[in-house]
C-alpha cells in the first residue's frame, strides 16, 4: 500500500476516523505524484484491511456458514473518497439471534466511523430470487468479490450468477441497454451540459460500466485488460478507453476530495477547485475551460467506443433469427438488413473520399444504420489519414453534395461529428471539440452548439415549426439551395477559443473554405458577411430601440438587401435556440419579427430617407379604433379622440393596435388617480403590466423592485408621458422560465404594485443569493451610444445579473434627476446587458459632464 494505515486492535470508531482523515490528507498531498489507479487501489486496500479486521474482531469469521462479499463499485475495486461501502453478507440460512446481533454490530461500527454503507444480508436462495426480479441486484452480484468468511459459499454464489436460468446473456444485455437508454433520456442525450455528472452523463463512467457488465456476463472478463485479451476490443480502442477512464477517475477522485458529501456533479464552484487540484493553470476561466475540454473529449470517446462495442455485441455475438437481405449499393457499399456495410474492408484506406459516401447513403435510406464493423474500419482509417479530407478534390465535391440531401444534418452531419469525420475534414474543427465557455449562457460546448444550430435550421422545414418560428419557417422552406446557410452555421463559432474576435476570424476561415470548395465571389462574400455579422440582429433587436428610425436605417445599411436579411434572420433564430433552450420565447419572437418587418419596409421604401413611422402610427390608430368599435359598444369615437389627443405620436408606434385598444378601453371613462392592469391577451410575446397614474418620483424604481420581488423577468419597459403629466407605462414580463403569467400571479402582482405606488416608501430590495452567480465575475461596463439626437441619450450597461440590479440602477437615475423613457432588459447567462433611453431633468440629452457623473456613480455602486 502507498499509505499504510495504523489500524489499532481492537478497532475504535475514533481511531478509524483519524486514519480515514490521514488517508485523505495523504491523497491531497500526493495527488499528482501517483497514478490515479494507484490511489484508487490504495484506498480499496485500506477498506479491505479494515473490514477484514473488523469481521475477525466481531468473531464473524468463526461462523462457518457466512461470508463477507464486496459488491458493486467496491466489488470491482473502484473506490473513491466518498464512495459507498457496498457489501453482501451471504448466510447459509436465516441468521440466529446471536449472529444477527454480530452482523448489526458490524454494520453499526461502520456507521459510527462515518461510512455510507450499502449492505444486504441474504441466503443463496434469496440472492437467486431477488436477483432474477431486479437487474440492479443481479448486476451487483455479478461483480461480487470475496473478502472474508466461507469461501465455498462465495463460490456457490459465483456459480449461481453464471447460470443461464439466472439471467440469460441476451436478457441481461437488453435490460442493461434499456437502463442506458433511460439514463441518456434523463440527460437529454448529450454529455455537454454546463454542470455534468461524471458518473451518469452520457459518456460518463456508467457507459464504461455497461461495457464491463456485458463482457463480464458474456465471458467472465473482470477488467478492461481482460476484455482486450479476449479480442472483444481492438488495441487502439483499449488505449483510448484507458486514457479517458483515467481522466474521469482523476476528476471524480479530486471532486470527492473537496466535498464533504457524496456527489458526482461538476457544479461551477467545484470545477474551479478540481481544475486547481488537477494542475490546470491560467488566469480566471481558461484553467476551467481547459479542464472541461479534456473532460468532454473523454466523455465523447467513451460514449463513442462503448456504444460501438455494444452495437458490435448485438450484431455479431447475440443470435439473430432475421433472414439476411442484401442490397448492393455500388462497388464498395452494400445494405445488409438495413445496415450499411463495406464490401471490402480496405475501402476507406484506399479511397478516403468514399468516407463521405457512407453518410450520403445514410441520407438516402432513412431507416439505415452503419454496421459496427464498418464503424470500426472508419475509425482505423481516420487514424491513418495523412491529410485532411478537405484537401482531396473528390471529397470536397461529396461534402458539398451532402447539404442538399434530405435530413442532411440529422442523418449525415450529426453522425459525421459523432464519429470524428468533421475533425478529419475541417482543420479548425478539433480546436472547438469539447470547448466550453465558463458562463451560464452557453449550456453546450461549441461543437455541440454548432451542430444544434444546423439541426435547428433543418427543423425550420417542418410544419411544426410554422407556429413557433413563422418567419424562419417561411424563409427556409422557400430557399431553393440551403447550402450557404448550413455552411454559415457550421463556421459561425469556429474561431472561438483562439483569442480575438471570433466573428472576424471565422469570416476569414469561411472565405478560405468557400474558395477552396469552388464557390463564386457572391457566395464567398455572403458567407463571410454572415459569419462576421451573425450577432448583429440579436444585438439590434434585444439591445437597441427598434422603433427608432435611425436604428432601423443603420441595421438595414449593414444588412444591405432582403436576401441577406432572410439569411441572417434564420441563422440568428437558430443560434439563439441552440445556445440555450430557455432563451427563445414568444416575447423574443415578436421582437425579431418587428425588426424583420421594419427592415423589410426600409428596403421597400429605399435607403435615401429614414423609415416614416407616421404611416405606421396612422395604421395602428385605425386598426385600434376598429377593434374598439367592434368590441366596446359603449365607447364613442369622440371619447377615443379626446384620450388619444393627450398621447404623443410615439405611443401609437410603440404599441400594437390590440394594446392601444386595451389601454383605451381601460382609460376612456377612468377618473381615478391610479390604474394597474396585467394581461396576457394584448401584448405579443409576454405578459403586459400597464400602469396609468400621475408621474411621480421613484416610479420606475418602485415598479421594478416590486416585479423583481415577485420573481418575474422584465424584458421591456416603455414610459410614455402624456401632455398633462400622466404616464402610460408598459412593462413586458414573463415568469423566470419565459412562460406567460397565470391569473393568480397576475392578481397578486396587481395588488402589490398598487400598494407600492400608493406608498411614499421605496420597496426594500429583495436579494436572494444565486448559487451559480457566486462563481462568476462580470466586468461592469457603461457605454453611451454615439448618436446625434438632442432629445435623449442611449446608454448600455453590462453587469453581473445580481438580484435587485435593475432597482439599484433606477434608484441611481432618480438620485441624479434623470428621466427614463425606454428600457430593454436582456439577460445573457450570468450577465445583464441592459439598454436605457434617458433624458436629464429638462427633457434633453445628457451633456458630457452628466454622462461622466452617471458613469462614475454606476461603477461605484454596481462595481
UniProtKB/Swiss-Prot annotation:
Function, as annotated: Modifies, by uridylylation and deuridylylation, the PII regulatory proteins (GlnB and homologs), in response to the nitrogen status of the cell that GlnD senses through the glutamine level. Under low glutamine levels, catalyzes the conversion of the PII proteins and UTP to PII-UMP and PPi, while under higher glutamine levels, GlnD hydrolyzes PII-UMP to PII and UMP (deuridylylation). Thus, controls uridylylation state and activity of the PII proteins, and plays an important role in the regulation of nitrogen assimilation and metabolism.
Region: Uridylyl-removing, residue numbers: 329-687
Family annotation (CDD domains): ACT_ACR-UUR-like_2, ACT_UUR-like_1, HDc, NT_GlnE_GlnD_like
Keyword entries, A-Z: Hydrolase, Magnesium, Multifunctional enzyme, Nucleotidyltransferase, Repeat, Transferase
Gene3D superfamilies named in the record: Hypothetical protein af1432
EC number(s) recorded for this UniProt protein: 2.7.7.59, 3.1.4.-
Biological-process GO terms, alphabetical: regulation of nitrogen utilization
Similarity annotation: Belongs to the GlnD family.
Notes concerning its domains: Has four distinct domains: an N-terminal nucleotidyltransferase (NT) domain responsible for UTase activity, a central HD domain that encodes UR activity, and two C-terminal ACT domains that seem to have a role in glutamine sensing.
Pfam families: ACT (PF01842), GlnD_UR_UTase (PF08335), HD (PF01966)
PANTHER family: BIFUNCTIONAL URIDYLYLTRANSFERASE/URIDYLYL-REMOVING ENZYME, BIFUNCTIONAL URIDYLYLTRANSFERASE_URIDYLYL-REMOVING ENZYME
Lineage: Bacteria, Pseudomonadati, Pseudomonadota, Gammaproteobacteria, Pasteurellales
Uridylyltransferase as annotated region, ranges: 1-328
Reactions catalysed according to its record: [protein-PII]-L-tyrosine + UTP = [protein-PII]-uridylyl-L-tyrosine + diphosphate; [protein-PII]-uridylyl-L-tyrosine + H2O = [protein-PII]-L-tyrosine + UMP + H(+)
Protein species of origin: Haemophilus influenzae (strain 86-028NP)
Required co-factors: Mg(2+)
Annotated ranges, domain ACT: 688-772, 794-863
Activity control mechanisms: Uridylyltransferase (UTase) activity is inhibited by glutamine, while glutamine activates uridylyl-removing (UR) activity.
Name of the protein in its database record: Bifunctional uridylyltransferase/uridylyl-removing enzyme
Domain HD: 446-568
Gene Ontology molecular-function annotations: [protein-PII] uridylyltransferase activity; phosphoric diester hydrolase activity
NCBIfam families: PRK01759.1, UTase_glnD
